[in-house]
């Protein structure tokens, strides 16, 4: 069988050498292909479950406009998840099974999403910190040498801009009162630590290998710094002890905690997974599939 032809391009910042463009995942070196499949599944699962958390606040939001925003963001995340699940067919995974047939321990969504979101400040922490972390990771694929990935992420990123603006506006609103700042403190501290860790360790060879292959444009440490720079000004309004401003810009005042961390799933190893009844049954669409006889 003749292998698919590939094109070439000149990489910037690397001395002008010619680098191969990959036309499909099958053309990737095996370690990079495996690492990218893991990453896409993490992103797909996290977006799908995050969509449920947004949907839960369509009717319970503080304002009508916020409820409408939650509806739009939920639809966005589900659409993005479907795009990513479909891509995993090229990595030897069954999108139908991924979407509808897995239990809690098989999901790779952030442990921040394992339990229902009980308060608006908790949802706001997910909106500003976790949602933006996903966007920073996906932005790193914008100029990917894997052409199908490069083309798919553009639509996702176009829709994600609104999510950040919504989060930034509501964080400023909460920061305007003592009660608001007090309410956001603990949710932001919890989400900050989880998201800081979510990008992975700079010593993670698989994640760093994706950057070396040009599948993403930066390794875990650089992506974490991008995320901090983006969200820190808003975080400083409600929980200033988490961040610090230096001559070089914003940084985290706390270091990532790697105890119990699984770099492949980007979850804590002892985290149980999303609640099966309250969250996953809806993610999978169990009730609707039962009505349809599936």
Give names to the regions the model predicted.
Residues 3-4, 73-101, 167-172:
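Conserved alpha-helical segments that form or flank metal/cofactor-binding pockets of metalloenzymes
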Residues 45-48, 75-82, 128-132, 154, ...:
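Generic structural signal for well-ordered, non-transmembrane alpha-helical segments
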Residues 2-23, 44-45, 95-107:
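Acidic, low-complexity proline/glycine-rich segments
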Residues 21-41, 101-127, 144, 177-178, ...:
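Acidic/His metal-coordination segments adjacent to aromatic residues that form catalytic metal sites
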Residues 34-42, 61-80, 123, 148-160:
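Alpha-helical scaffold segments that form or flank carboxylate-/histidine-based iron centers
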Residues 182-294:
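Extended, helix-rich structural scaffolds rather than catalytic motifs
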Residues 50-72, 134-150:
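Helix-loop segments that flank and shape redox-cofactor active sites
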Residues 113-166:
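Internal, conserved structured core segments that host functional sites
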């Amino acid at each position: 069988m003749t292998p698919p032809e590939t094109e070439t391009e000149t990489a910037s910042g690397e001395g002008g050498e010619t680098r191969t463009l990959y036309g499909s995942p099958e053309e990737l070196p095996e370690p990079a292909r495996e690492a990218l499949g893991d990453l896409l599944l993490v992103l797909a699962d996290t977006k799908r479950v995050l969509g449920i958390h947004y949907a839960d606040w369509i009717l319970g939001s503080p304002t009508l406009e916020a409820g409408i925003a939650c509806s739009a963001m939920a639809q966005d995340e589900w659409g993005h998840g479907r795009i990513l699940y479909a891509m995993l067919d090229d990595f030897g995974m069954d999108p139908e099974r991924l979407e509808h047939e897995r239990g809690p321990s098989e999901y790779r969504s952030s442990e921040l999403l394992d339990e229902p979101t009980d308060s608006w400040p908790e949802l706001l922490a997910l909106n500003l910190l976790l949602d933006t972390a996903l966007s920073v990771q996906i932005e790193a694929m914008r100029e990917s040498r894997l052409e199908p990935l490069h083309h798919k992420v553009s639509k996702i990123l176009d829709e994600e801009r609104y999510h950040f603006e919504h989060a930034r506006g509501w964080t400023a609103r909460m920061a305007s009162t003592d009660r608001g700042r007090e309410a956001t403190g603990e949710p932001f501290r919890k989400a900050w630590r989880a998201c800081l860790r979510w990008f992975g360790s700079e010593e993670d060879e698989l994640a760093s290998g994706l950057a070396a292959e040009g599948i993403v444009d930066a390794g875990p440490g650089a992506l974490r710094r991008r995320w901090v720079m983006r969200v820190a000004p808003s975080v400083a309004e409600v929980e200033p002890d988490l961040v610090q401003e230096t001559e070089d810009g914003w940084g985290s005042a706390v270091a990532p905690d790697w105890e119990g961390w699984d770099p492949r799933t980007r979850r804590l190893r002892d985290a149980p997974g999303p609640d099966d009844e309250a969250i996953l049954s809806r993610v999978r669409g169990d009730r609707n599939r039962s009505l349809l006889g599936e």
